[in-house]
Structures are given as structure tokens and as C-alpha cells.
Amino acid sequence: MTDTRNGEDNGKLLYCSFCGKSQHEVRKLIAGPSVFICDECVDLCNDIIREEVQEAQAESSAHKLPSPKEISGILDQYVIGQERAKKVLAVAVYNHYKRLNQRDKKNDDVELGKSNILLIGPTGSGKTLLAETLARLLNVPFTIADATTLTEAGYVGEDVENIIQKLLQKCDYDVEKAQMGIVYIDEIDKISRKSDNPSITRDVSGEGVQQALLKLIEGTVASVPPQGGRKHPQQEFLQVDTRNILFICGGAFSGLEKVIQNRSTRGGIGFNAEVRSKEEGKKVGESLREVEPDDLVKFGLIPEFVGRLPVLATLDELDEAALIQILTEPKNALTKQYAKLFEMEGVDLEFRTDALKSVARRALERKTGARGLRSILEGVLLDTMYEIPSQSDVSKVVIDESVIDGTSKPLLIYENSEPPAKAAPDA
């Protein structure tokens, strides 16, 4: 084959044999035996092949479901700790998609029910990351919804059916794909009703939303306007069956540990009562492991809603050692991400052990868990990331504890020179 650019073959104007455009209308025209193809048609063919390969891979991965151990092993690469939660999620997700793979088989007199999941754990403990990693592993559409923005139909705010619309957007409005997806509803504890007793007043963002979510989570046919349009009577809707969508709800449930402790430590009063010291109190994570459906009802979730979330997984608070692991070990660890950014500038980035410990301590003080690690590192590295692109002679940047504490600046090591003395502490 020859590449015919903007020259003519024997004074004759050449055309693409596929789209009919002349050589002057395209960037390149490739010549074959008695045929020509332009660069635009080549790009189009590549796109078609790429789409077909992706669809074939998606179909094969749907039939090749990883085992619970394999699922947990992949979660280990991204999420530190939380072994119990990983095991619960791996089994629940495996059973859910095994059920979907079997649903078309005839002469099966046993109908398997759907097991939606409730994740309970402190802020920054990895609830959202677990759900995201599961969806990526299984190659299914995934969306995150914030329960605090949801209201009952007819009130200002997001309708619960908007959740399904977001899921459709993730898969280009392919209804079949959406019906195999995963929905993560965050901050689910924020829609708890304010007291144990049903209120006579309308609670449009609490109990009312729980009622609206019931059918969606259990399984219904949701009517969603196509391509994200607004609803109006003359419009045709996309019908999405939610029976096979896996719903994972997550929340911090602050104060739930007190409900559990009150139930488990209920005792008598008087001289014969058992005396308990404050030191005997359990950690939040240990208390949450003992949660029962009645505790969630007392917290403010309605019994019907609790019943729709039969699989319960609790996550522990992250300690200093776990936060240091999160900074360094996962595939997407923050220190690896920042090292990659510096590497693009031809600079090595080194975090000393005392610096990592200091970052972890600051995150614990802020009570933000792993979520606060990035903001701490961003603040520490901001000035360095601003200056480095303008300095071509820097070969290495070293971060130690004093840099994290703000008492000194990062150590810059220059090419072909002795390492300079550390910068004096800021006045």
C-alpha cells in the first residue's frame, strides 16, 4: 500500500472508495490495489472494532464470575484492612451475579431473592471505595447517589428515580446494561426519622425518602425520561426493571454505637448492679459489629427499609498503622500518585517514615479517616509543585516530619551538586 498525500496520481483526482471524499477533503489517502481509503474511514473502522471488542470482553467477563476469594483478593489491592467487610461483600456480590446468570434457566422451581447490602462505618473508612472497586472488577455500570439530596416526589430536590437516570447515563442509556449495574447510596443514615415513633407531620427528606426508596431497592419498573430530559405527560419513558440492580447503602451512623451499648449493657440498679468503668468501653468499630436490625430501627430507619437490606457489613475505624499502609501500599496509594506526578517533571519524590506517621496523626486528629490524607498532602506539596516545573536542575525532593508539621520546607537535591543544607525553619 502507498500513502497518497495531497499529490495526484497521473494528474487524476483521487477519491476514498468508502466515503467518496476527494484527497483534498481529507488529511491522508492510503492507496491499495485499485482502492483508496482515507484517514477518517480508518479512524471510524478502528472505533467500530474497539466497540465490538469491548462488548465481547464485557459478555465474557459476565459469564466468568470470579470466586469470593478472588473478589476479596482484588479488593485487598485497593482497600487496606476491613477483612470482615471484604468477606461479606465478596460473598454477597458473588451470590447476586450468580443468581443473575441462572435467572434464564427453565424448569427451576427455586426463585432466588436479591440481597442488597448495608455498609456501616466511620467517615473515611473505605465504604465508597469498596463499592467502586467491586463495580470496576465486575465491569458493570456504577453510580453514586447522595441520600441527603433526595426528597419525596413532588417536593423540591432529587426524585429517587434520578438515581436510575444517573446509572443509565453511565452506560449510554443501554437499559440491559443498567439492569445489571450497582448503585451506591451514600449518607443513608442522614434520612433516618427523628424519633422512634412515626410522625404525624410530613418528613420529606427522612422517613418519606425511605418509603420512596423501598420499591426501588426491592424491585420495580422505574420510568426514566430518555437522555436526561424532564418528565412531561407526552414523553415516552425508558422502562428500567430494578429487580436485578444491586443496591449498596452506606453511612457513618454516628451514635449507633450508643444504641448498641445501651442494649447490650442494660442491667439492674442498686447495690447488686454490675459496676462498669469507662475504661471498659469498647471502640466504635467493636460495638458496630454487634449491630442488630432492631438497633437500626431505634436509630431511625423504618423496619421495612431495614428488611430490604439483609446483608450487613461493618467497617472499623482506621488507626495510625492502617493510614500509613493506605498512604503507601495500594495500587493507587497517594504517595505513588504524587511520586508519578513528580516523575513526569524528571524529579524523584521521597517520603521519610516520620513524615508518613505525621500525616497519619494529623488525619486522626481531623477525624476524617483516609479521606483527609489527600488534603494534607496537597497542602504540604502545593508550593513545591508550583516551583518544580520552573526549576530544571532539581533531581529529588525529600519530605520529612518537619515539613508535614510546617516547621521547615522540603529538602531539594540538585543535579551534579552536593545536597544543600535544609532550609531554615520559617520565622
From Swiss-Prot:
Among the record's GO biological process terms, what is one?
A: cell division
Binding positions for ATP? 122-129
Q: Which domain of life is it from?
A: Bacteria
Amino-acid positions noted as binding Zn(2+) in the UniProt annotation, renumbered to this chain:
16, 19, 38, 41
Which GO MF terms does the UniProt record name? ATP binding; ATP hydrolysis activity; ATP-dependent protein folding chaperone; protein dimerization activity; unfolded protein binding; zinc ion binding
The answer to whether UniProt assigns keyword Metal-binding to this entry is yes
The reply on keyword Chaperone is yes
Q: Which residues form the ClpX-type ZB domain?
A: 4-57
User: Which keywords appear in this protein's UniProt record, sorted alphabetically?
Assistant: ATP-binding, Chaperone, Metal-binding, Nucleotide-binding, Zinc
**Entries under Gene3D superfamilies matching the protein:** 1.10.8.60, ClpX chaperone, C4-type zinc finger domain, P-loop containing nucleotide triphosphate hydrolases
Q: Which Pfam families does UniProt cross-reference here?
A: AAA_2, ClpB_D2-small, zf-C4_ClpX
Q: Which GO terms describe its cellular component?
A: HslUV protease complex
Identify the InterPro entries for this entry. AAA+_ATPase, ATP-dep_Clp_protease_ClpX, ATPase_AAA_core, Clp_ATPase_C, Clp_protease_ATP-bd_su_ClpX, ClpX_bact, P-loop_NTPase, Znf_CppX_C4
Protein purpose = ATP-dependent specificity component of the Clp protease. It directs the protease to specific substrates. Can perform chaperone functions in the absence of ClpP.
Q: How does it assemble?
A: Component of the ClpX-ClpP complex. Forms a hexameric ring that, in the presence of ATP, binds to fourteen ClpP subunits assembled into a disk-like structure with a central cavity, resembling the structure of eukaryotic proteasomes.
Please report the name of this protein according to its UniProt entry. ATP-dependent Clp protease ATP-binding subunit ClpX
Q: Per the UniProt entry, what species is this protein from, by scientific name?
A: Pseudomonas syringae pv. tomato (strain ATCC BAA-871 / DC3000)
**Source taxonomy lineage?**
Bacteria, Pseudomonadati, Pseudomonadota, Gammaproteobacteria, Pseudomonadales
Q: Which gene encodes it?
A: clpX
